[in-house]
Amino acid sequence: MTQVYIAEAATITSLGDDLDTLYQGLVQGKSGLTHMSDPGLPGHLESAPPRFDTSVYTSPWAGLIPNLIPKELSLNNPAPLIFSLADRLLSKLGPIDPSTCLITASTKAGIDLLPTITRNTALLPKGLLVSSLPGYISQKLGLARPGFNISAACSSSTIALAKGAAMIKSGRETAVLVCAMDVVSEFIFSGFSTLGAMSPDPAAPFDKNRKGLTLGEGAAAMLLMNKKELNTAKKTGKRTHLTQISGWGVASDASHLTAPARDGLGLKLAIQEACQKADISFSDIQAINTHGTGTRHNDEMELTVLRDLFNPTIMANSIKGAIGHTLGAAGAIEAALCIKLLETRILPGTPGFIEPAPGAQNIISSRPRPFGKGPVLTMNSGFGGTNAALILSGVAP
Amino acid sequence: MNNAMIRGMGWVSESSRGYPGQVLCSKESHGLPRISGKEILDRPHKAFGRMDPFSKIGFAAITFALADAGIARSKSKKNIAVIASSVTGCLETDITYQATLSREKGILPSPTLFAYTLPSCFLGEASIYHGLTGESFMVEEEIPDGLQGLSLGLDLLGDGGCDALVCGLCNSNINGVGPINTTCPEPGALFFVFEKQGSRPGHGIITENRVQNIFSLGNKKINSLTDLGKNILVKKTN
């Protein structure tokens, strides 16, 4: 059977511009969340330019990437902020073969350009449509094909990785590059504020007193390869074998547009499918990265799923109290983090978690914990009732 | 080689909507039709009235396609996947939301409208109404043919990842907004229902030659999902 290897991974988050820094920051309990309006408060980043006035919204907090500023494609032709983020992400990668298939994952990509067109609708700027993101990245990398974007709310990049893995397994592709990213814009910020989903304080996933989510921005790239392609890359010294995506599953709740199914039906189906593909049972999984947004319904649903499928000693965490909810990029950032989990066998703590929500005791901890040898699971859910799960395993010596 | 039987087809375009044998021509002189819930649903469904125009046309085309395929809405959930391709996404909805945001200075934008600025939300609406628990996601790309989404869907169907596949196109009308540096697709929605080949009749067999990256309906090469729809209708007429 064709195996799917992760040959290279890179992340950019509010906790730093690489995967090691992100992982170390999480283990050390650091927070990348920024108070966007009050420089006097802890967490304010002087290097982050003000994005917008947050005084009318329900939260001033966000996980912003330092020094991320928009560029101009040409004179008076602004590019969306996401193109700057894409440039920064691509600079972290080694050479990519032009035959590589590109899948991007983003929910709203260049939506920060929208205010410019409502004032002057003469010409829609390049980069406003999400569909332009893969073309931009493909051109930057000199790929033979333009690629495509997968959009499925907060499961976008988890599904993109699942599709990339499926394409390699089926023999359709030998190498797939998944680039996931989303930025904090007023458009998105106002929406989550008006939905009442944002916490006035930094998000506290699985805490009894959690009040909602904190938004963040980030990016992740993962280069997937089959064994033959990987061996060739290894011989040329370009790549190392990091880990495998051994299982993936995607399913819908068919229940509610903006709230998860209380019984976690869709997420259970996705995990079940991922375990079947990986040929493992639930009890083989050693640690779990949850979606863990900090909203009441999401965290409750995930705890139900953990309780129903896994044994009571399972360890799980959420990183969204440290870097915020990075929407379409969340799944890929968290999957990349699983590489570090498999390498170190230490699961970072859950920032903001103080008093356990019902059912969270022992499963969630604020502190890093060692876990046993075996695969790890990462899972995400989103609006529209979408759910996706990935199983990662097998780190090379 | 991937292949599947086309069981159903449904669409909403500027000129007509429905499915083969059940076509309603538009009364509007231009633009996409305003579709009422009564026209497509077997019982009242409040959510339909709340949807943005992009979601309404996508939801309606999926509903027409499932009706054409004889897949009735039932209480039992079905492992049917939904994949939609789009160039424009829900840009019209984004613009409407942004206008409320600018007008109200961020204080009172509509939460419902915001939810529909995620273009994949109509797939969730269709999943909820029809009880579909399979995969659902949008493929957004500058090439408007919809064939990338079809490839992903046929792989999924062939691999046993779903019992049936709903796959198609959905695009906003962005002509009123202004030109854009990309191929502007025709506004509207077009969806098909695919199943593995079996005894049930259908509109024909779609075949994908994965080596040559060619799709065909019988001996006829297919260049896009729109092309596929036109060929099915021509075949029906003949």
Positions of PLM-derived features:
Chain A
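Stable alpha-helical structural segments in soluble proteins, enriched in small hydrophobic residues
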Residues: 81-95, 160, 270-278, 309, ...
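Active-site-proximal alpha-helical scaffold in enzymes
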Residues: 141, 148-180, 215-237, 326-347, ...
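Conserved catalytic cysteine-centered active-site region
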Residues: 35-80, 106-163, 172, 188-190, ...
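Short beta-strand segments
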Residues: 103-106, 151, 176-182, 224, ...
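Acyl-CoA/ACP chain-elongation machinery
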Residues: 172-194, 199-203, 210, 248-262, ...
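Extreme N-terminal starter segment of soluble prokaryotic enzymes
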Residues: 1-7, 374-375, 387, 394-395
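Condensing-enzyme catalytic core mediating Claisen C-C bond formation in acyl metabolism
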Residues: 2-13, 19-20, 24-38, 43-46, ...
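Conserved small-residue
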Residues: 8, 26, 86, 102, ...
